């Protein structure tokens, strides 16, 4: 199954970008052993519309346009369901085992996600009850993708 990230906003050079690249590289190297492949980070610029609702709608349209047909869509949202790392790995493995070919994890813009995306989403997850800056969300989800691969493969990276 091919996995990609969609993010509103561009990650500037710095330690966060370096960490994201490091974890996604590890994911790419280890994922093929468990049937997972990393495709890309699709970054789109934030909408310049004058109000939040229009910005969210425009950003949602960009996300939907970038989705492959039949792609599983996982939204990251502070009101989503909290999973531990093993449950996240099981979720990804389950989609893979169902024969899903594409999965996209979406990180919304500063205003959040448009309501239309929740209807389209297969799952809405959170990274805890706290609000995180977007650059750290990318780092956290990249690490969790790598951790999921190590859990699915039985690698000792994930120790409880």
Curated annotation (Swiss-Prot):
Give the main EC class: transferase
Record flagged with keyword Chloroplast: no
Enzymatic reactions = pseudouridine(1915) in 23S rRNA + S-adenosyl-L-methionine = N(3)-methylpseudouridine(1915) in 23S rRNA + S-adenosyl-L-homocysteine + H(+)
State where S-adenosyl-L-methionine binds.
76, 108, 127-132
Record key words, sorted: Cytoplasm, Methyltransferase, rRNA processing, S-adenosyl-L-methionine, Transferase
Any single GO molecular-function term of the entry would be: rRNA (pseudouridine-N3-)-methyltransferase activity
Question: EC number(s)?
Answer: 2.1.1.177
Tell whether Cell division is among the UniProt keywords. Answer: no
Specify the domain of life of the species encoding this protein.
Bacteria
Q: What is its main location?
A: cytoplasm
| CDD domains per UniProt | RlmH-like
The cellular location(s) given in this protein's UniProt record come to: Cytoplasm
Q: Looking at the UniProt record for this protein, which Gene Ontology cellular component terms does it annotate, in alphabetical order?
A: cytoplasm
Subunit and interaction comment? Homodimer.
Instruction: Name the protein family.
Output: Belongs to the RNA methyltransferase RlmH family.
Function per UniProt: Specifically methylates the pseudouridine at position 1915 (m3Psi1915) in 23S rRNA.
Q: Which PANTHER family does this UniProt record tie to the protein?
A: METHYLTRANSFERASE (PTHR33603), RIBOSOMAL RNA LARGE SUBUNIT METHYLTRANSFERASE H (PTHR33603:SF1)
Q: What is this protein called?
A: Ribosomal RNA large subunit methyltransferase H
Organism, by scientific name, is Rhizobium etli (strain ATCC 51251 / DSM 11541 / JCM 21823 / NBRC 15573 / CFN 42)
- Gene encoding this chain? rlmH
